């Protein structure tokens, strides 16, 4: 609020010209949360798992922190793949699950989606993948229609591993292809060439036993509208159930980030990435695929994308594995990232916690409603604040700049607005927090 007790919307206006924002902004995790003291972690965890679940959907996330190679763009690399280390990790991961599976919290509500992330979950052996999936199905209350996603890559994801996942109960595969172009794949340190990646995806689809989805990245070095269009056409023609189109996020600590900083390579500008995204949206629309969220498209009814949708809606998430993060009943936590420390905690029969954060807000659900609304391009602002009309000048300006379909307080994003969704989310998050603050706080000079 300014000195006249009116909301200053101008810092959130879109810029003049072809590009409404300088770059895409990112929302920070644990925003507004209070850390639990280190000496209170164990006690707090016991209190958490002895409480029943809140009336929300529930998810499970498992982190597999091993990769055979370090892709140049990836900021999630933790540990190099080793067969013995993976087998040992599986033993400990199952122990972590079993340690708390019988708790009040874990048994108090059905689980609607399970996600194996990493790292590279498909690097585990067929036997170990089956063991983990079987443990989850036997020990936790998975819903009958629970979505069980295995994230993987082409390298080493052989028929034995795939069939072991399917036989154990996995029903969705998400494969990080990123690009089918052999030259671009080589620059990213992807070991398989384009034809090999295509053949792998085709073989996965032909099994016809699970939803098959692939990730494609836009904004990669050497990528242009032509190569991007070729990737989109291949994804369309393979027979996939769904596809994810993600913008490359250049992280300073990655090999690619360092190469960009040193001038050894270049990546498309924000405006060029925007154009590639719009190209992808138009292509998927012309192909008849339905837009599930800002980055996800489905071709068949098999593809539900439950985990990604529900996590944006504020679903509770149980988390297992080194580096895994979860949230439940107003608390968020992160497991130990250091593999040795994680192993030592599990071996001692302790939850391998690195930190726990407590949400300071009494009612934070509006943030989840906002986030999920932006993610699906429809934000009913009147349901988030009784003062939505105060946002009218901003909504009108965004509409004028092509970010929304109209200027109403039910914000409906265009494809342009979808690309800049993180900026819109950040602005609305800040503004609604001010609008919903007690009047005495809004009136402070």
UniProtKB/Swiss-Prot annotation:
GO terms for cellular component: cytoplasm. Binds 1 [4Fe-4S] cluster. The cluster is coordinated with 3 cysteines and an exchangeable S-adenosyl-L-methionine. One of its GO terms (biological process) is porphyrin-containing compound biosynthetic process. Residues 52-287 form the Radical SAM core domain. Disulfide bonds: none annotated. S-adenosyl-L-methionine 1 binds at residues 61, 118, 151. This is Anaerobilin synthase.
